[in-house]
Each structure stands twice: as structure tokens, then as C-alpha cells.
């Protein structure tokens, strides 16, 4: 007779969870940040709000974003005028878009990740799907399973309405699944489309305007598994340690509410200040056991909620400017894509590291950190170990 303990031991993987492939996708419609204020105020019939437009122009100029990708084209917005108004009932119109487009964009990213992984999709044992864009039953996880033709008994996890920290959450969950289920291969997909948050400008809700200046659409997928098959699977990053915490005195700092008018977005406190004030504590908890106290010796992946967060974290920790290079590049080229951002940054980092022959997937360094920041204020921390290139 086999004991429960023996069964448990047999279920566990030998080594740490490892990122084995990454894929990303965006809608084809690309918007230029420098001309976006003109377009945004025209399409929302708000050109008479000249002072507000000047404010928005300044927000866009300071955003450090060059371009973003959006499912919402001028044509779609003209067909759905309620989406362009500031607070018009429009949830049905928004939902009709995102329940189709979120899994579709997710499929595009997942297909690229599976291709890079090089294994048959029948070997995917678990699926984690994450989006803050719309809610449906059965969920986007089910739709993606159908779109990709995954096995019907793939084990699915659907994460709705998590917000910008969730790129860290999905890696934490994938790590636990991979390490506790021998042979598991976890497909992780974050797909975000701003059709739920887009709306016209208002003098009384400037935090909504901040969102209009920052948010973009994108999907990212990773394959995670332990004990990579030699000569078959190519490890990129090892997921060594994870944590999640709610920052003190931060309640209501970032809120989102799903209403008849879509998803409303609220910034109620000094978010960059709260994050920078608490970042060192998170780093000490993560890296003290490894004997690391020089945070410039790490490679950095931080959710680019906005340039002020990155600036204040850099200043607080005396980070060298190049530390946030990959993070700032993704912000500049795509905007804030909520949960998908940190996975885009992982992709950018491994590509750049290979191109520049830096020796490891983490800019030539051995250890790194990935941070997700979002509603709560919630902070996700992931300790990464790079792989030799």
C-alpha cells in the first residue's frame, strides 16, 4: 500500500519553476502619443473644453509614452457613441467587444509562446488567464481553450478584475502549480483591452483622464514548468521566490469599479510616494536571505504604472538609470497594459540581453526582481534567477 506521503513526494517537481517561452501581441491599430490629445478630444466631441485639453496634452507629454496600441478605432467609436461620452450607460457595448477580443488577442500571444516553446500544445496541463477587461461565463479561459484547441481536461484558472499587479500574481500561481505537479506545463496569458475604461474627459474626474493618457492594449503569454527537458526546452528565467502584500495606509489609493458606464478608474492618493516608501521593505524581505543588499546588482522589471512611480523608486533606492531600461522601453512603446506589462518587459529583457551578448537572460546579471503594483495598494514581488545565454 502506498502512503499519502509517498504520493505527495512523487507529485513534486525536482527543480524550480522556469519560464520556458514568452509571446506577446497587440491590436494592429497604433496611436501616436504626440497627436493623441487632438484625436481624443475630437472623437469624444470635447474640443470646446480647451483648458482640459491643454491639461491632457501636458499629461501625454509627461507620460514618457511614444505610442500605444488600441482595439478601439475611430470607426468603432463612431458606431458606439455611448463609449465616447463621459458617463453614459455603455457596459453592454463594451462587454460585447471585450468578451470576443480579449481571448482573441490572448490566443495571438499564446500561439507565439507555444511556437517558441516547441512542444505540442497537448502537453499543456494548466491554463491561467488574467484580464481586467470585462467578465463573462464561461470565462476567457474557456474561450481560449476552445480557440487554441487545448485538451478539454486542461486545468483552468480564471482571474478577473485584478488590475496592474496581476502580472506578478500569475507568475506566483504558475510557480506553485509547476513545482507541486511534476511534469506540469502551465500556459499563462494576460490579455488587456482598454475598451472597458475608455470614456470622454471630465473636469471633475482628472484621475480618469490620467488613465486615458496612460493605458494601452496588449496580451502576453508565458509557458512555465519545472525540470526543463534537456535539448528540447530552453529555460529563460527561474522563478525562485514570490510574495504579495498590501501596503500600509494605502486603502483607496487605486480603485476600479465596474458600473453601467464601464470600468471606472480612481487614483485617490500619492501612489508613487506609497510605493517608493515601501519598496525597500519588500526588497529586504526578498533578498536578505540571499545575502544581497546592493539593488544595483539586480536586473529590474517593474510594472510601469507611470513615469513618476519609476522615477521615485529609482531615487529612493539610488538605482542607476539603466536599471529600468527595459521597463521604460516597454512604457514608451506600448503604454501601461495593466497585467501584461511585466511579461512584455521580461520578453524585452531576454531579447536585448541576447542581442547584446550579455551572458545571461538578465542583462548579464544573475539575480533579478519583478514587481507588480496595483489596486489595494497591492505589491507582488517575484525573485528571478537568470539563465546563461
Swiss-Prot record:
EC number: 2.3.1.74
GO MF terms held by the record: naringenin-chalcone synthase activity
Gene3D superfamilies documented for this protein: 3.40.47.10
Keywords, in A-Z order: Acyltransferase, Flavonoid biosynthesis, Transferase
Enzyme type, top EC level: transferase
Catalytic activity: (E)-4-coumaroyl-CoA + 3 malonyl-CoA + 3 H(+) = 2',4,4',6'-tetrahydroxychalcone + 3 CO2 + 4 CoA
Residues spanning the signal sequence: none
Active site (record annotation): 164
Pathway: Secondary metabolite biosynthesis; flavonoid biosynthesis
Family that this chain belongs to: Belongs to the thiolase-like superfamily. Chalcone/stilbene synthases family.
Name under which the protein is recorded: Chalcone synthase 1B
Species assigned in the record: Pisum sativum
Lineage: Eukaryota, Viridiplantae, Streptophyta, Embryophyta, Tracheophyta
